[in-house]
Amino acid sequence: WALPLGLLVGTLLALGSVAAVWSLAGWIGRSRSHAGRIESVAALGDAGTEAPIEVICAMPPSWGGHRPGQFVFVRFEGTEGAHPFTIASAPHALGNSPKGEPLLRLVIKPLGDYTRTLPQRLHAGQRVDIEGPYGRFDGKGSRRRQQVWVAAGVGVTPFLALLEARQPGLSTGRSDSTPAHMHYCTRDARRDPLLARLQALCAQAVPPVPLAVYSEAQGQRLTPQDLEAAPGPLDIWFCGPQGLGDALHEHARGPSPWRLHRESFVMR
């Protein structure tokens, strides 16, 4: 241990121990933690237990706001540890609660054991602990590249926030006005509870965002060639299941002039 290598190993072990204690004590992210309140909970659509829920959260004064496309770690009162969810609203889009608290929207789809229990366990007035925001899935790209947005299933949530930020009166900067094309993959367009809102946001955006919908129930599937219909080099922004993301990643490694930005669904 007296040798330089031993001193280095000892220092690294000490730093690792401190980091482990810091993590186990729950101090990571503490400066970004906010105790909010559920303002409302509502089921979207008529898909029964498979319907996503919209959770509106009222945030405390410590909340410093967010950028479109960011996510947060959420721990609902009486449930297990924190889970990541994308903020599905643009900054200031929902205004404030009657108490003057800033509001944000979460759209949660029942994809697993935990999320399937939330419709029965969440209610207005309940405490919610939110850590964040995190991430840079902001749709900012070069004006020399065509912006192409690709969403599948609940992966549409960051794009709802990006599109909401492009609505009249909410646009805040150069990145909001960069022309983009939207591609949305869904199991069944006829029963998709988020599609109507997506269509309205695309149509009313400034500038409008052309939307292509691929409904699996109608035999429609997205291919890389569909994305390459846009001329020139592409900035591809993708959020959705890992399989489709991997396919796009493999294609982006080829000769196509793609730059792929990908929001991961595998983080826990």
Task: Give the label of every model feature segment.
Residues 22-129, 138, 147, 179, ...:
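Ferredoxin-reductase
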